[in-house]
Amino acid sequence: SDIQWKFSVYRDNVSWYKKCFSIPMYRYDLRQYKKLLNVFYLPTDEMRAYLKEYPELLNRSAILMPGCAEYDVDAVQAISDLTAKKLEILYVGGIDRIYDLTVFFQAMQQMPDQVHAYVCCREKEWENAKSKYLPYMSEKISIIHESGQGLEPYYKKADICCAFAGEGDYMRMAMPIKVFEYLGHYIPIIATKDTAAGKFIEKENLGWSIEYNQEALKQCLHNILQNPALLQEKRESEISAYEANTWKARAKQVILDLK
């Protein structure tokens, strides 16, 4: 379940007449769930705090995070030789409303040319949001609009994936599905500390969970440039964590919960 509609990121960006219809319907859905569901799955424990007005539903709730799909990925890759190539970062997802890449763009502007990022988003979303990002654009950032198989060449290039895309109450509660896409490709992840993604990455040692500011990101990237063996260390943690986080593993949990 997702409850974006309870937050300002939804309320401040949706027309009043749409909210007049949609929010009562979202509440209606929640009231109906308690009549229809045996188990009510939430992606994080933090989401429970926003559903206190539905105690019957919370009594049958359980945590079920998104899962990893199966990708054609080599389980072991060589340690990146960053003297011979750039450190490549990949971000896939939204850039407006919920997810904010301003701090990421600002930090990238100040990084050496040895670091490069691909930012993948919907073309329409880029057109709507680009005025916010253009002051920080440089040759270190390439904007792409790909999905599905079109993304695979960029995953093959990437040394790091980015989940460093904002902070706040919604980010502390919501678990981005892209984190599991990154994990499924065995690519180390940089995320914002004290968000749902950051806590998961920190717990499983899948990358770096850092404060949401330019200096923290720059320090993290400089550290990786100086110690590229860290990439292989994080990748090995992802290989170990993969099986427990596939969609098959999630399905097995559902089977056990419904017995």
What residues fall within each predicted segment?
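Short beta-strand->alpha-helix junction loop in the catalytic core
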Residues: 46-47, 64-75, 124
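Nucleotide-activated donor-binding/catalytic signature segment of Leloir-type glycosyltransferases, i.e.
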Residues: 127-157
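Conserved donor-binding/catalytic core segment of Leloir-type glycosyltransferases
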Residues: 69, 81-99, 105-112, 118
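Glycosyltransferase donor-sugar binding loop
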Residues: 92, 116-129
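Nucleotide-sugar-dependent
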Residues: 99, 151-154, 161-181, 190-199
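A charged, aromatic-enriched C-terminal amphipathic alpha-helix characteristic of glycosyltransferases
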Residues: 212, 226-258
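Membrane-proximal helix-turn-helix segments that form the acceptor-binding/catalytic region
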Residues: 19-40
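Conserved acidic donor-binding segment of nucleotide-sugar-dependent glycosyltransferases
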Residues: 203-215, 223-229
